[in-house]
């Protein structure tokens, strides 16, 4: 079993967000994580959140514990602080669950 997060973002700076992805992916892979799906969304038909969403993706980890370790990793937090906060207006957690 693996652990999957489904996320929705409102990306406001595509170039800066791409830099974030390029820098964080090696860290993500070092934890055994990866992106399963990644979509740019042009229209949201229904949402439980008031946040705008223009990007939807899944991010997969070997376990919830590994996911938690990744998101608290100092190297990841430095990349997030440098690129993510200036490129994303809002974050919507759509779902977290065990996956086959």
What is the role of each PLM region?
Residues 1-72, 96-100:
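Short S/T/G/P-rich N-terminal loop/turn motif that feeds into the first structured element of a domain
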Residues 34-36, 80, 90-94:
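A short linear hydrophobic-aromatic micro-motif
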Residues 67-89:
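C-terminal structural segments of small proteins and small subunits
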Residues 84-100:
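C-terminal end-helix/capping segment
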């Amino acid at each position: 079993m693996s652990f999957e997060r489904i996320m929705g973002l409102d990306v406001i700076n595509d170039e800066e967000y791409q830099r974030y992805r390029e820098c964080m992916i090696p860290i993500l892979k070092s934890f055994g994580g990866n992106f399963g799906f990644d979509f740019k969304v042009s229209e949201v038909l229904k949402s439980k959140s008031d946040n705008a969403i223009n990007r939807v993706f899944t991010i997969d980890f070997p376990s919830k514990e590994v996911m938690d370790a990744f998101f608290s990793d100092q190297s990841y937090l430095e990349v997030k602080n440098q690129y993510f906060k200036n490129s994303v207006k809002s974050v919507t957690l759509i779902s977290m669950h065990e996956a086959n």
